[in-house]
Amino acid sequence: VDGAVTSRHPGEGIRSSVRVREPAIGTVGGVSTPETTPAAPDAVPGVDVAAVTNWFESSIDGAHGPFRFDVIAGGHSNLTYRVTGANGARYVLRRPPLGHRLASAHDMGREHRIVHALQHSAVPVAPALGYCADPAVNDAPFYVMGFVDGHVIRDRAAAEAVLSPAARRHAGESIVDTMAAIHAVDLDTVGLADLGKHEGYIARQLKRWYGQWNAQKTRELTAVDTVHDELLRRIPEQGPATIVHGDYRLDNCMVGDDGTVVAVLDWEICTLGDPLADVGLLQVYWTGPDDDASAWTGSATTAPGFPNRAELAERYAAASGRDLSQLPFYVSFAYWKLACILEGVYARYLGGALGQRDPAELEPFKLQVDGAAAKALATLESLG
């Protein structure tokens, strides 16, 4: 399950106090197992312990209380708890953020549906055990999965501590093979053909995120406007729609000791669309040992043994049979989208989402937006 996600910036001064999950950029301080915060048995933020205990015992086979709920730190995204029963059985509970009111942005039923459907595919996911939308049980809907043992690699130190160089190599290969498996899922067979619109994915994404940029920008940044216009003009013809994870990267996968992906995490923004959007985003997040730097530093995949970006792309092309001649377009799109997302985070923090802060303390956010926009433009220009 996803743990604490702490953005690493060019300036590290705010690293301990700023947590970002929209999505996270860079790396996370932490080790291979999720960071948890133990809660008093009868006082767990976001969980009505008595009512949820009753639900567990009546809805989940073999579940017996009392239960211990440990918060797995998760920033501003859906909250995740490790739940341990009296018999030692472990589960994972997911619910929307505290104070959350917009159901469409954190649709637990939709996320549960995706995870449950993918159990009948070649994609490794945690077992989906139950979903509850009854307000009499909790103040917000939640769903429960089985607990999966594995490593969530969030920084280079964790990669070197838990994976051998050979396992790092295999992790890169397994992450690509798993992504290809996601994109190969037969939508009708698993019942997800109506998960989203099939056509026009990139155009819709450009409209959505450019609207967000213009609504929240803190200053003019010509590169964002230029890249938007050029991307809109150059959209490649989309093939058949597939599942698009939307935030596919190393630390949204759990891997075993040998590097094999044992579960893909964080399906909350999954939809249908152009699979190459996932490929482009993985290229942005991934910096192999001999790759040029990304727009941010500290990638876990710089550790010796991990494959480089070109090797990932070659493996995906072989596994999927897809033409990657337009991959720079999708890499540029990924950088541009992340610039728009980070600008929104920066704007909210400038507006007091962290409390009163010195704007200079938040300057690293601005620098990351600038860097991502510059990378988007440079990558697009490489297409000629």
Task: Put a short name on every predicted segment.
Residues 243-245, 250:
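Catalytic-loop of the protein kinase fold
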Residues 30-33, 37-42, 215, 296-307, ...:
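ATP/Mg2+ or Mg2+-diphosphate-binding catalytic cores
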Residues 278-289:
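C-lobe/activation-segment region of protein kinase-like
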Residues 265-270:
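Activation of the activation-loop gatekeeper triad in protein kinase-fold domains
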Residues 32-63:
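Juxta-kinase regulatory segment immediately upstream of eukaryotic protein kinase catalytic domains
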Residues 66-243, 256-259:
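ATP-binding pocket architecture of kinase catalytic cores
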